[in-house]
């Protein structure tokens, strides 16, 4: 039973450690400029205005749409979950096989005791 808890705990830990950094990126927070930054992107070297980066007003390209939430890759948690399922299935099959073998051995001992008695 301890191995079952270990397998489930490992899956949960892997899912949490894999999803936590991606969830922080999915919030849409942008990095802030350092406090000692003095560059002003709005003016050029000679005082003229520099156009802002991005698409021009007459461009036909659409604005970028946000990705659906959660925009994370579930490959690692799915693989680990699949391994957990296989492990649990193997544990169940092993327990069933062990039970059947014990019953068969008990029947053999019973027959041997009856024959040689």
Curated annotation (Swiss-Prot):
One annotated Gene Ontology cellular component of this protein: host cell Golgi membrane
Glycosylation sites: 36, 46, 58
Principal location: host cell
Keywords recorded for this protein, A-Z: Glycoprotein, Host endoplasmic reticulum, Host endosome, Host Golgi apparatus, Host membrane, Membrane, Signal, Transmembrane, Transmembrane helix
Membrane topology: Single-pass type I membrane protein
Compartment list: Host Golgi apparatus membrane; Host endoplasmic reticulum membrane; Host endosome membrane
Pfam families in alphabetical order: Alpha_GJ (PF03229)
Domain of life: Viruses
Descriptive protein name: Envelope glycoprotein J
The encoding gene: gJ
């Amino acid at each position: 039973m301890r191995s079952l808890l270990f397998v489930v705990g490992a899956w949960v830990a892997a899912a949490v450690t894999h999803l936590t950094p991606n969830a922080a990126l999915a919030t849409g927070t942008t990095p802030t400029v350092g406090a000692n930054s003095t560059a002003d992107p709005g003016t050029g070297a000679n005082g003229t205005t520099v156009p802002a980066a991005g698409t021009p007003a007459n461009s036909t390209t659409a604005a970028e749409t946000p990705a659906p939430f959660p925009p994370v890759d579930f490959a690692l948690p799915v693989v680990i979950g699949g391994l957990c399922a296989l492990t649990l299935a193997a544990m169940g099959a092993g327990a069933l096989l062990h039970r059947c073998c014990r019953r068969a051995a008990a029947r053999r001992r019973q027959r041997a005791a009856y024959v040689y008695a």
